[in-house]
Amino acid sequence: MLRLEECRNYESHDFRVLPVIGSGEFASVHAAYWKNTQSKFAIKKFDKISTEKEIINEINLMKMVDFHPNIIKFCGIIKDETNYSLVLEYADSGTLGKYLMENATTIKWESQLKFAKEIASGVLCLHDNEIIHRDLHPNNILVHQHTIKITDFGRSSILNGVREKPIPNTNVKFIELYQKCWRNKPDERPEINQVISELNNVNPEINFNFQVNELTEELKNEDGFSDCDLSNY
């Protein structure tokens, strides 16, 4: 078991801390610059009720898996008068939820499929190391340079069970896969290896062709476009 004194220790004055970029029930996250440089980090500040044991547990879990490209990297700790803070890799595009909202009309299907594969790859790494995240949702998944980063290995919580409705024009195979992952009985849900296998078999061209054909049909109903066939372009 790791001890806090074995981690790289930073002083609070080593960073120029910026306003809060995210917060939860037990901690807040700030962006921060290292000294007088443009090197940016994320500082996770725990509240006063977080115990040293809980903090050590979160650090241990991160250090077991942060070699993976889709898991946020742990850089060190800061100890001040009241509590500890974690120094973490900074994700320049924020949470996946925020990223999808800001790019809802422009994000391509290929990017969506890439993100899904990266999330599955990160989860597989956790499971290979016998770690269950327990609180994986779009606000605990970050995007850095168009790459997924899973974060927040703190306390577990129970979500409200609300499931999103399929977004129009989403690839049918993709919808079928994530609906299987939502099944109420755990033994009816696919294993993570099966999820990755099925994601690798999803053909983004099918979704693209569907959208082109749908648009072609719409244009055929418009005056002057009866002979239009976008599938040739």
Label every model-predicted segment.
Residues 82-95:
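Conserved short submotifs of the Hanks-type protein kinase catalytic core
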Residues 47-72:
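The N-lobe alphaC helix and its flanking beta3-alphaC-beta4 segment of protein kinase-like domains
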Residues 18-29:
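Protein kinase glycine-rich loop
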Residues 127-143:
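Catalytic-loop of the protein kinase fold
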Residues 28-48:
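Glycine-rich ATP phosphate-binding loop
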Residues 182-194:
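A conserved short helix/loop substructure at the end of the activation segment
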Residues 102-114:
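Activation segment of protein kinase catalytic domains, centered on the conserved DFG
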Residues 73-84:
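Short beta-strand micro-motifs within the conserved protein kinase catalytic domain, predominantly
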